[in-house]
Amino acid sequence: MKVKPFENVRDQFGFCGIWCGSCSAGNGAIVELTRRYEEIVKKNKLEKWAPKDFDFGEFMKGLASIQKVPLCPGCLKGGGNPTCEVRTCALEKNLPSCSFCDQLRKPSNFQSLEKALPNIREDLIKIKNVALQELIEKYISELKGKFPHCILFCSAL
C-alpha cells in the first residue's frame, strides 16, 4: 500500500525532538509542489511561452526527477541523515528520544544542533512532558498556514 505524503511522518518525532511532519523534504511537500507545478505548466502550455534559449525538455525532466524523490520514513525508521550524531548517540544509549537523556541540560551536548535549531532543547522537553497527539495537532494547525507545507492540505489547484 502506497503511503500518502505527510502521513509517512505525521506522528513521528526524531531522536532530536524535531517533528518529522514539519520537514518539507521528507513530508512530501516539495514533491507535491513539483507535481502541481508540472500540471500548471502543462495545462497552460508554457513551452510555447518559453524563451528560445530555454531548454523546456530539460526543465520538464528536472520536474519529473524531483517527483521521484522518495518520502522519508523519518530517522526512527531508518530515514534522514545516516551520519547524524544525535541519532547515533541515542541509539548507542538505547533511548527512544534525546528527551530521556540525563545529559540533555548540559550545554555542550547540543551545540552543533542548536546552531541550526535554537529551540531544540525546549522542543525535547516539550515532547517528554506533554501528550504527543495534542502537540502534533497543534503543529499540524500551524503547518497548514505555512508555505510550502500548506500544499499538503490543499485538495485543489
What is each residue range found by the language model?
Residues 1-157:
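Cysteine-centered metal-binding/redox modules
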